[in-house]
Amino acid sequence: MRIIFAGTPDFAVPSLRAAAQRHEVVAVYTQPDRPAGRGRGLTPSPVKLEAIARGIPVFQPQTLRSPEALATLRALDADLMVVVAYGLILPKAVLAAPTHGCWNVHASLLPRWRGAAPIQRAIEAGDTETGVCLMQMEAGLDTGPVLLSQRIEIGEQDTGGQLHDRLAALGAQVLSDGLGLLRAGIRPVAQPQPADGVTYAHKLDKAQARLDWAQPAQELARRVRAFNPWPVAEAILAGERVRLHGAVALELAHQQPPGTLLAASKQGIDIACGEGALRVRVLQREGGKAITAADYLNARRDLPALR
């Protein structure tokens, strides 16, 4: 089976490997190289690096809407296009080009968390489970019928990065199952998404990572987990801005204003919130690396009252 694969970040790499294992991936589409790192040099996407390692031709158009881009894609004569976190909108003509259309691996249980950041939004919202859907793509944003799906639990301490890796592996397995069925001549039954329960996972940005101590500690702890490893939660602690890599909520009654440091030990730094307190365990000062609360306290000798 001739497959076009379209994807860009790390999340898509296991799915590319799954597609290439038993099928002919005739081309990989990925985002153009972007400036990255301290030198801001052009950096290829993880999917591009994987494709090059496998000897698969790589295409990096700025858009798929041009007649030239469509002609190039059609000339590949693909049976199926698999899309995993590609980052470009596919026009209707592209969706209709392959014999079996376009499949998408999406990291949520649709219709919950359509959109760009389903993994982080699930943690942020306090969801206890999530999963992966293999979807037949249509013109709407993640609105297509679901072909296959798998569920997993979200652990109480799962970070965005940890859940990302588990779902990337699960997505590859679900895709492999779907491709196996199609190769055997069995087209997965397309189940329309229900009209109820639709939510949207809006794109992450650094501004959303700034914590407000007036919010409940439970909400803040979930955001710390969700935004690890990016964009990483940040807040004002003891008069300086820090990034929070690890924290837990405490059901602690207090009468202190939000943001007040309540206690500190090698177990963590307890900060008053609108409800309860947040115990910060791992944090990062500006220009530094992530350190434990104990190491932070050793560096902040100006806080004797907290020891």
Curated annotation (Swiss-Prot):
Q: What class of enzyme is it?
A: transferase
* Transferase found in the keyword field: yes
The entry marks the following residues as binding (6S)-5,6,7,8-tetrahydrofolate, namely: 108-111
One Gene Ontology cellular component term attached to this UniProt record is: cytosol
Q: Does the keyword Iron apply?
A: no
Enumerate the Pfam families for this protein: Formyl_trans_C (PF02911), Formyl_trans_N (PF00551)
Which terms in the Gene Ontology molecular function aspect does this entry carry?
methionyl-tRNA formyltransferase activity
EC assignment: 2.1.2.9
Q: Which NCBIfam families match?
A: fmt
Q: What does this protein do?
A: Attaches a formyl group to the free amino group of methionyl-tRNA(fMet). The formyl group appears to play a dual role in the initiator identity of N-formylmethionyl-tRNA by promoting its recognition by IF2 and preventing the misappropriation of this tRNA by the elongation apparatus.
Please give the HAMAP family that the UniProt record associates with this protein.
Answer: Formyl_trans
Q: Which family does it belong to?
A: Belongs to the Fmt family.
According to UniProt, the name of this protein is: Methionyl-tRNA formyltransferase
The species this protein belongs to is Xanthomonas axonopodis pv. citri (strain 306)
Q: What is the lineage of its organism?
A: Bacteria, Pseudomonadati, Pseudomonadota, Gammaproteobacteria, Lysobacterales
Q: Which gene encodes it?
A: fmt
